[in-house]
């Protein structure tokens, strides 16, 4: 950042433009969109709270970020987790400005906040069967449902599916098909063997996407809109988005079936197993299975 970027909006705008140039290199498009959204809220906040279009970096105090945080949650009605992610972006830009010598101190350095840990949403085994077998009248809804199911049976997230090519589908020495790739988000390597259900979906839509892609992926908003209608038809009241498919694979199809966490971590393309532990939710079925195993091993040792 050059010396002339000494006001908050200018610095933030410059950083956001720089992110755009780095898309596909070391930053994702979703990161750029998030910073663009934060910039829009920041401009609105300055107008709302101070009747300003911009503010000098030297005039920033901790009270600024405190008021901005409250503004995001009250005026913008953002959930606590979303508001914290926006605060992360503002904090990052101000920290970079301080490190680059544009301000003598970081006024936000001591501001403490934490995002609440929200439970990961996933479909249970019963819900997954209902979701899979429910007859849908709309061809669009059926296609969007099948994309979601493919993600459920392979763990591949939306962006990785968007760029999934037929060249990534490789047979092993016994003829079983595998997907090999690197996650767009982290660069971490992942590898997943095809389940029969996923293979049927791949064959169903083979040749329908522009070469060399495996699927023609609609926008996430369009798929999620369809998922809301489908889950309602299936009698599922929870809010299900496309990313819930990845959670379903990890929790319902793997961890609930006794697959080791380290193995699931490799399939998900996580660089650290602590990331995978977020998915390790203990379900009632897992508890019941654990008690059954304890009972089997103890036999009648402690019977009255």
Briefly describe each language-model feature range.
Residues 294-304:
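C-terminal secondary-structure termini that scaffold catalytic or DNA-interacting sites
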Residues 118-121, 125-127, 163-201:
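Conserved tyrosine-mediated DNA breakage-rejoining catalytic core shared by Y-recombinases
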Residues 30, 38-48, 63-65, 74-109, ...:
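N-terminal DNA-binding recognition helix of tyrosine site-specific recombinases/integrases
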Residues 137-138, 207-213, 225-266:
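Short, basic (Lys/Arg/His-rich) helix/loop patches that form interaction surfaces
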Residues 80, 84-86, 103, 108-158:
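Basic, Lys/Arg- and aromatic-enriched nucleic-acid-binding interface segment
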Residues 122, 183-187, 220, 268-293:
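Catalytic-site neighborhood detector that most strongly recognizes the C-terminal catalytic loop/helix
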């Amino acid at each position: 950042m050059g010396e002339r970027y000494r006001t908050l909006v200018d610095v933030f705008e410059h950083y956001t433009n720089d992110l755009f140039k780095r898309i596909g290199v070391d930053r994702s498009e979703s990161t750029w969109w998030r910073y663009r959204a934060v910039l829009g809220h920041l401009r609105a906040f300055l107008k709302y709270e101070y009747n300003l279009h911009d503010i000098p970096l030297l005039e920033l105090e901790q009270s600024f970020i405190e008021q901005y945080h409250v503004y995001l949650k009250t005026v913008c009605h953002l959930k606590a987790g979303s508001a914290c992610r926006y605060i992360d972006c503002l904090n990052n830009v101000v920290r970079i400005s301080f490190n680059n010598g544009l301000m003598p101190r970081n006024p936000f350095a001591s501001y403490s906040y934490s995002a609440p840990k929200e439970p990961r949403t996933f479909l249970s085994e019963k819900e997954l069967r209902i979701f899979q077998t429910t007859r849908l009248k709309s061809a669009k809804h059926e296609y969007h449902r099948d994309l979601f199911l493919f993600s459920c049976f392979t763990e591949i997230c939306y962006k990785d599916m968007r760029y999934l090519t037929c060249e990534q589908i490789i047979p092993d020495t016994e003829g079983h098909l595998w997907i090999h790739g690197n996650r767009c988000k982290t660069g971490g390597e992942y590898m997943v063997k095809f389940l029969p259900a996923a293979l049927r979906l791949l064959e169903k839509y083979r040749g329908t996407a522009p070469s060399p892609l495996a699927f023609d992926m609609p926008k996430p908003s369009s798929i999620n809109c369809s998922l809301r209608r489908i889950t309602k038809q299936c009698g599922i009241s929870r809010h299900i988005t496309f990313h819930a498919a990845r959670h379903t694979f990890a929790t319902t199809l793997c961890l609930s079936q006794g697959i080791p966490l380290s193995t699931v971590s490799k399939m998900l393309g996580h660089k650290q197993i602590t990331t995978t532990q977020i998915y390790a939710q203990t379900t009632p079925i897992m508890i019941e299975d654990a008690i059954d195993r304890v009972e089997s091993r103890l036999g009648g040792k402690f019977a009255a």
